[in-house]
């Protein structure tokens, strides 16, 4: 396999065209969003949901912003790619689960959960989005299942950050499924790099 890579500090994150969801162009933006939501809170255990090549998680681990990293994705072909990135960077504190949402992830607690899930509930008719697995969450069922189960995996002071697309969604679409699970929206703001397209959603547990 001919892997490409993108560097973040001393970390090389490997990817292929088949497995990339445009995250290779977002790393600095993902880091900016993390700083915006997390602030100075120390992070010990991070989950990257819908990880694909692991741009978000590996960049956090490589820049020492998290001590351990779990990656999860439903798409089995990402596993050897992730293992290659782990080996090339000599990472020891990383695990991967091939999982439909949380179904195959053992119960554990994360203080940061990040994700770049499918951004549209219908076909967006944009040539770039040419593989439904990457972009389509029909009826928002993937998001709904995520919010229905994420509390079991989130520490009481844990933080969730998702990157979404302005042409596919807005905070009010997700608010009902968030609030019904005793979670709350803490932040929503536009991308620095792609302000017309991408936006970020910050969520935590409702303290009441």
Identify what each model region corresponds to.
Residues 1-38:
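Class I SAM-dependent transferase core
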Residues 29-106, 112-115, 121-122:
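Conserved SAM/SAH cofactor-binding pocket of Class I
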Residues 83-84, 125-128, 173-176:
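Short amphipathic alpha-helical segments
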Residues 117-145:
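Mobile active-site "lid"/loop adjacent to the S-adenosyl-L-methionine
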Residues 142-197:
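Conserved Class I SAM-dependent methyltransferase catalytic core
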Residues 201-202:
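C-terminal edge-of-domain segments
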Residues 206-208:
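Flexible, glycine-/basic-rich loop-and-beta segments that form/coincide
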